[in-house]
Swiss-Prot record:
<dbReference type="GO" id="GO:0002020">
    <property type="term" value="F:protease binding"/>
</dbReference>
<keyword id="KW-0732">Signal</keyword>
<feature type="disulfide bond">
    <location>
        <begin position="39"/>
        <end position="152"/>
    </location>
</feature>
<feature type="site" description="Involved in metalloproteinase-binding">
    <location>
        <position position="61"/>
    </location>
</feature>
<protein>
    <recommendedName>
        <fullName>Metalloproteinase inhibitor 2</fullName>
    </recommendedName>
</protein>
<dbReference type="GO" id="GO:0008270">
    <property type="term" value="F:zinc ion binding"/>
</dbReference>
<keyword id="KW-0646">Protease inhibitor</keyword>
<dbReference type="GO" id="GO:0030426">
    <property type="term" value="C:growth cone"/>
</dbReference>
<feature type="site" description="Involved in metalloproteinase-binding">
    <location>
        <position position="67"/>
    </location>
</feature>
<dbReference type="Pfam" id="PF00965">
    <property type="entry name" value="TIMP"/>
</dbReference>
<dbReference type="GO" id="GO:0008191">
    <property type="term" value="F:metalloendopeptidase inhibitor activity"/>
</dbReference>
<feature type="disulfide bond">
    <location>
        <begin position="29"/>
        <end position="127"/>
    </location>
</feature>
<dbReference type="GO" id="GO:0051045">
    <property type="term" value="P:negative regulation of membrane protein ectodomain proteolysis"/>
</dbReference>
<keyword id="KW-0479">Metal-binding</keyword>
<dbReference type="GO" id="GO:0032487">
    <property type="term" value="P:regulation of Rap protein signal transduction"/>
</dbReference>
<dbReference type="GO" id="GO:0005178">
    <property type="term" value="F:integrin binding"/>
</dbReference>
<dbReference type="GO" id="GO:0045861">
    <property type="term" value="P:negative regulation of proteolysis"/>
</dbReference>
Amino acid sequence: MGAAARSLRLALGLLLLATLLRPADACSCSPVHPQQAFCNADVVIRAKAVSEKEVDSGNDIYGNPIKRIQYEIKQIKMFKGPDKDIEFIYTAPSSAVCGVSLDVGGKKEYLIAGKAEGDGKMHITLCDFIVPWDTLSITQKKSLNHRYQMGCECKITRCPMIPCYISSPDECLWMDWVTEKSINGHQAKFFACIKRSDGSCAWYRGAAPPKQEFLDIEDP
C-alpha cells in the first residue's frame, strides 16, 4: 500500500472517530451558581417524576422522527414559572445529547429548573440545574422563594484560577472552584449575589431578606 493510500485511510479513520465522538461532545456545559441557574430558567419547581415514556416530537430535516423522553410529574411547589402547574417534563433520550435521567415512581423529590414549553410542559437538559431536593442546603431552599430573584440583575463570574478580578461593580466573584475545588462549595450553598442600593452587587449570606444597606457578608 502506497503512502498516499495509507494517509487517506488514516484521514478517513480519524473522520469516522470524530463523527462517533461528536454526540458526546455535543453536551458541554459551563458550571453555574444556583442563583444563575434560577435566573436563567423559565421554570423552577420542586417535583417528583411519576412515570416516563418515549414519545415522538416531530421530524428532523431528513424526515426522521425526533424522540424525546416524557416524564409525567407531580409538582410540589413552583418557585418561578407560569400560573399553570407543570404536568410533563421533556428531555433528550440520551445523556450524550444532554438528556436527563430522573428516578420515577414518585418517591424522589427534585429541584428542577428548565425552559417552558407552554400548556403545562417544560424541557430540561444536563446543562440545567436539576438536583435531588434533599441535597440542597437550608439556605438554598429558602433563597428559592425570593432572594435569588433579588439578584437576577447581578452577574456572577466564576473564578477558574488565581488571580481573577471583577470588571464591573455589578459582578460577584464565585470562588468555590479555587478555594474548594468544587462547584458545590460554600458560596454555592450559603450565598447569593444581591444588588445594593448604590447599584453595585455583593455576596450576601443568610436566610433572611437582606437589609437595604448590607455588608458583603452577613451571618444568618
